[in-house]
Amino acid sequence: MSETTDYGASNTGANEESLRMVSSQPIGNEPVSDEELRPHVLGGFIGQPRLKAQLQLFLDAARKRDVPPDHILLAGPPGLGKTTLAMIVANELEVPIRVTSGPAVQHAGDLASILSSLDVGEVLFIDEIHRLPRAAEELLYIAMEDFRVDVMVGKGPGASSIPLTLPRFTVIGATTREGMLPSPLRARFGFTAHLDFYPHEELEKLIERSANVLGVNLDTGSAHELALRSRGTPRIANRLLRRVRDWAIVHDLIVVRPDDVKEALALYQIDSEGLDRLDIAVLNAIVRNFNGGPVGLNNLAAMVGEESETVETVCEPYLVREGFMIRTPKGRVATEKAWQHLGITPKDDVSKLF
């Protein structure tokens, strides 16, 4: 197994999002990827079959050529396994991995210090790489392309730049916002992998694997109930599984049945669609208070007692993706699916909108 060095990697995200059970960001001190649940080889990584096939070919070719692989960019929503894949790459290559994050790199010198300490073949994993300072990005361009960093010696007019040659290494960058990466930085990655949300079937397999690791005896159908509520995101699935495990321990359950899953997660106000209290409050406001919409973002946020940014960035992406809401030039509109989920008969003109 590869050696891991952590240079201030941080778990960041909106404060409001980090308090939700269905958040794709880590909650509190929750690790980005639990060591006990993390697979260490590509064959043990569940889901993302096309990406795995591409990555396997990429790594096999590097091993046969006996050179470190090209730099890798992992892009996709939070909680889908980007950090886990970075660890797997290092394990597959049997090399150490250094871990840092964009927010942890305050100055270009911080990054230069890390780069200058790398050995041949090492992996440098930069989480949230889109949040690197501009000066650090520019330093990284040269390091990734030419395997050198320019060290400034002296100050003022007499300052000079001395090139420091670096051993060949591999950068793995992870980002939830690929569009924020400057084109010169994106161009230096030889392989870009896009992670997608998981279908229920793959999430069920992941939940069953995690349950075995955690010692949770799930009855037939229990993994399915968990998958329905996990928003296509492994991090959420594992978090909800832990809460169900707590329920089973407190209630002395030997086998966790589907009804136990429903009851345990109902305690946290998580329904069968993965919607929580805030999601339901938003839908209720649109449907009950604004007759289905359209309603402006500020009015909607005021109705549910949240900041506009919270509603827009925390709630809306999932509600839109799952077809409960649409954004129109006039405002937010609840779909027929939203009315039905709330148990309210849609008004006559709702179905005509879609």
UniProtKB/Swiss-Prot annotation:
Coiled coil: none
Positions with a binding annotation for DNA: R327, R332
Superkingdom, taxonomy of origin: Bacteria
The reaction(s) this protein catalyses: ATP + H2O = ADP + phosphate + H(+)
Segments of this protein annotated with the region Large ATPase domain (RuvB-L): 4-198
Gene Ontology, cellular component aspect: cytoplasm; Holliday junction resolvase complex
Binding annotation for Mg(2+): T83
The keyword Translocase is assigned to this record: no
Annotated Pfam families: AAA_lid_4 (PF17864), RuvB_C (PF05491), RuvB_N (PF05496)
Molecular function in Gene Ontology: ATP binding; ATP hydrolysis activity; four-way junction DNA binding; four-way junction helicase activity
Annotated spans, Small ATPAse domain (RuvB-S): 199-269
Chain residue ranges for the region called Head domain (RuvB-H): 272-354
Keyword set includes Endoplasmic reticulum: no
Binding sites annotated in the UniProt record for ATP: L37, R38, G79, K82, T83, T84, E145, D146, F147, R188, Y198, R235
Record-listed E.C. numbers: 3.6.4.-
InterPro entries referenced in this protein's UniProt entry, alphabetically: AAA+_ATPase, AAA_lid_4, DNA_helicase_Holl-junc_RuvB, P-loop_NTPase, RuvB-like_N, RuvB_C, WH-like_DNA-bd_sf, WH_DNA-bd_sf
Domain comment quoted from the record: Has 3 domains, the large (RuvB-L) and small ATPase (RuvB-S) domains and the C-terminal head (RuvB-H) domain. The head domain binds DNA, while the ATPase domains jointly bind ATP, ADP or are empty depending on the state of the subunit in the translocation cycle. During a single DNA translocation step the structure of each domain remains the same, but their relative positions change.
PANTHER family: HOLLIDAY JUNCTION BRANCH MIGRATION COMPLEX SUBUNIT RUVB, PTHR42848
Function: The RuvA-RuvB-RuvC complex processes Holliday junction (HJ) DNA during genetic recombination and DNA repair, while the RuvA-RuvB complex plays an important role in the rescue of blocked DNA replication forks via replication fork reversal (RFR). RuvA specifically binds to HJ cruciform DNA, conferring on it an open structure. The RuvB hexamer acts as an ATP-dependent pump, pulling dsDNA into and through the RuvAB complex. RuvB forms 2 homohexamers on either side of HJ DNA bound by 1 or 2 RuvA tetramers; 4 subunits per hexamer contact DNA at a time.
NCBIfam families linked to this entry: PRK00080.1 (NF000868), ruvB (TIGR00635)
Protein name (record): Holliday junction branch migration complex subunit RuvB
